[in-house]
Amino acid sequence: MSLLTEVETYVLSIIPSGPLKAEIAQRLEDVFAGKNTDLEALMEWLKTRPILSPLTKGILGFVFTLTVPSERGLQRRRFVQNALNGNGDPNNMDRAVKLYRKLKREITFHGAKEVALSYSTGALASCMGLIYNRMGTVTTEVAFGLVCATCEQIADSQHRSHRQMVTTTNPLIRHENRMVLASTTAKAMEQMAGSSEQAAEAMEVAGQARQMVQAMRTIGTHPSSSAGLKNDLLENLQAYQKRMGVQMQRFK
C-alpha cells in the first residue's frame, strides 16, 4: 500500500458515511494526484462543510496544507488552529512538545506512527498544531505518520461506541437503529435506481419503506416490529442489485 493510500484510508475512517464522505474522498484523491492546487479554495470549502467535527476539519486542513503546494506567506486558517490546540489544555501542549522532539528523530512514516500511538488524542492534535503553526518542522512522511496515529485512535473510540450501540439490549435503541438503517437503505436504493428499467420497482419498494418508517414513528409501535422491515428491505436491495449486475459489499 502506498503512503498516500494509507493516509487516505485512515483519514476517511473517521468521517461519517454519507454523500459528504464520498465528496471528501474525491477531494483527497485529487489533492494526492496533484490535480487540486488551490489551497485557499480547498480550505474555504472545508470550513463550510456541515456534520464534520472541528477536530476532523482540523485534521483534513492539516493534510491539505501538507500536500498542496502553496506560497510561503499563505495565512494559517483559524478553524484549523482552534481544532489543533488540544482543547487549550497545558498538559496536552507539554506532551505535544515531548512527542515533537521524538518525531524530529524519526525519518519514516511507520516509525513516526508507532511513536505517536502511545500519546493521547489531545496531545497528538496539539502536536499537529505545533507543526501547522510553523513552530516546528518535520518531514511530510513523519507528519503523515502523526495524522494516521491520530485517526487510528479516533476510529478506535468510534468503533467502541458503535459496537456498544449494536450490542445494546435496550429494545428502544435497537428499534430506532433498525428504522434508521431502513431509511438509509431506502435512500441508497433510490440513488442506485437511476434510469434503469427496474428503477420504478426500486423506487416503489424504497417509497413503501419510507412510509412504513414514518408511520411507525408517528403512531409508535412495539420495539420488535421493525426487525422484519429492515430485513425485507435489505433482501429487496440485494435482489435488485443482482438484477442490475451491481455487487455491493455487504450493505449493512
UniProtKB/Swiss-Prot annotation:
SMART domains: Flu_M1_C. Residues 1-164 are annotated as: Membrane-binding. GO terms for molecular function: RNA binding; structural constituent of virion. It is a peripheral membrane protein. Residues 165-252 are annotated as: RNP-binding. GO terms for biological process: viral budding from plasma membrane. Keywords: Host nucleus, Membrane, RNA-binding, Viral matrix protein, Virion. It comes from the Viruses. It is found in: Virion membrane; Host nucleus. Its main location: virion. GO terms for cellular component: host cell nucleus; membrane; virion membrane. A motif (Nuclear localization signal) lies at residues 101-105. Homodimer and homomultimer. Interacts with NEP. Binds ribonucleocapsid by both interacting with genomic RNA and NP protein. May interact with HA and NA. Cannot bind NP without genomic RNA. Belongs to the influenza viruses Matrix protein M1 family. Plays critical roles in virus replication, from virus entry and uncoating to assembly and budding of the virus particle. M1 binding to ribonucleocapsids (RNPs) in nucleus seems to inhibit viral transcription. Interaction of viral NEP with M1-RNP is thought to promote nuclear export of the complex, which is targeted to the virion assembly site at the apical plasma membrane in polarized epithelial cells. Interactions with NA and HA may bring M1, a non-raft-associated protein, into lipid rafts. Forms a continuous shell on the inner side of the lipid bilayer in virion, where it binds the RNP. Determines the virion's shape: spherical or filamentous. Clinical isolates of influenza are characterized by the presence of significant proportion of filamentous virions, whereas after multiple passage on eggs or cell culture, virions have only spherical morphology. Filamentous virions are thought to be important to infect neighboring cells, and spherical virions more suited to spread through aerosol between hosts organisms. Most abundant protein in virion. When expressed alone can form virus-like particles in transfected cells. This is Matrix protein 1. It comes from Influenza A virus (strain A/Gull/Maryland/704/1977 H13N6). The lineage of its organism: Viruses, Riboviria, Orthornavirae, Negarnaviricota, Polyploviricotina. The gene is M.
